[in-house]
């Protein structure tokens, strides 16, 4: 290397290092490097074990490489080195060494597989998780709750997710909670964890499942026992009684109940509201206003976004099975008013 180029190389290296370090900044809401459950800690332990092992292998191999390059570099006037056609000892060594390294990788990996096999102690909270194109359905048999996209769990209590799919293969993944599990039609997989930190943890479908796969988000809300009990009480309460609705909200209820032509364009054909309809193709709306987001986490749950969604769902989520049925501005206003009362 010409010495006058050293400052340029140093400058490029320094800039590259700064950019690399900047890229390590946060926040990263879906980072697996900050676990908050026993499942997540098990994966983190395995990752760190293999990382340090791999780093050690890298240092040894690269050190030997640099030594050979320097020690046996070409020198002026030096004759060509003799050709070597094999060394049995070396060949045996570099065959056995990777096998030994893989043994050190395999043992903790297998241990982690058994630690995260989906089993949980008696008394765990069981939740049925059903993947749909492109949203998540959650059923709590213990409480009789059916909701969507926002998974509420209590801190410190073991939880078992029983995963399946209503259509294609999906994969439930909330990185800070733990590893992903596939949701497959006519099959049940299990994911067990005990969360130890209160907060909202983002997740995503991690198996390509169609046109709006990237828009199939989820949120895991870990709550203290008192907050979780309050959420359960709110979700098991009956929906707002009709006689307490305002005139605008009552018109929204009538729009929700209306049988349209074709019938598949009717709200009650796909959505359930306790005591009013029993649709199963779309998310249960009994307490839809209590959720923080709509459209599988794409939009904050407010009146403006509800109106956008009702006007043209496919403009927000391409491929959505919910049709744009040509609602008027007044109809949308009434429906939004009614849905916002469903807390």
Predicted features and spans:
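Non-transmembrane, membrane-proximal soluble domains of secreted or membrane proteins
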Residues: 25-49, 69-266, 273-280, 297-311, ...
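N-terminal secretory/membrane targeting signals
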Residues: 1-26
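Short, solvent-exposed mixed-charge patches
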Residues: 342-343
């Amino acid at each position: 290397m010409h010495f006058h180029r050293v400052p340029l190389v140093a400058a490029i290296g320094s800039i590259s290092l700064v950019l690399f370090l900047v890229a390590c900044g946060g926040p990263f809401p879906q980072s697996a490097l900050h676990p908050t459950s026993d499942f997540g800690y098990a994966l983190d332990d395995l990752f760190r074990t293999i990382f340090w092992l791999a780093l050690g292998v890298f240092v040894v191999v690269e050190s030997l490489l640099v030594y050979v390059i320097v020690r046996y570099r070409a020198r002026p006037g030096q004759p060509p080195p003799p050709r070597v056609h094999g060394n049995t000892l070396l060949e045996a060594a570099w065959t056995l060494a990777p096998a030994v390294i893989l043994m050190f990788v395999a043992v903790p990996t297998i241990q982690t597989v058994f630690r995260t096999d989906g089993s949980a102690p008696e008394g765990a909270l069981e939740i049925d998780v059903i993947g749909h194109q492109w949203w998540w359905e959650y059923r709590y048999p213990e409480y009789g709750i059916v909701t969507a996209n926002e998974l509420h769990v209590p801190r410190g209590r073991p939880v078992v997710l029983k995963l399946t799919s209503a259509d294609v293969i999906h994969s439930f993944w909330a990185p800070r909670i733990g590893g992903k599990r596939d949701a497959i039609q006519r099959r049940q997989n299990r994911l067990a964890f005990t969360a130890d930190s209160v907060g909202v943890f983002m997740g995503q479908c991690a198996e390509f499942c169609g046109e709006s796969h990237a828009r199939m988000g989820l949120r895991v809300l870990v709550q203290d026992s008192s907050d979780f009990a309050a959420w359960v009480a709110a979700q098991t309460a009956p929906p707002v009684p009709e006689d307490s609705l305002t005139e605008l909200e009552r018109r929204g209820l009538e729009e929700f109940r209306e049988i349209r032509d074709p019938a598949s364009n009717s709200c009650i054909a796909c959505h359930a509201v306790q005591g009013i309809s029993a649709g199963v193709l779309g998310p249960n709306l009994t307490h839809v206003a209590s959720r923080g987001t709509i459209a599988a986490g794409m939009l904050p749950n407010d009146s403006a976004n509800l109106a956008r969604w009702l006007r043209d769902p496919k403009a927000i989520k391409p491929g959505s099975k919910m049709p744009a049925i040509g609602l008027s501005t007044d109809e949308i206003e009434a429906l939004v008013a009614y849905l916002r009362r469903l807390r």
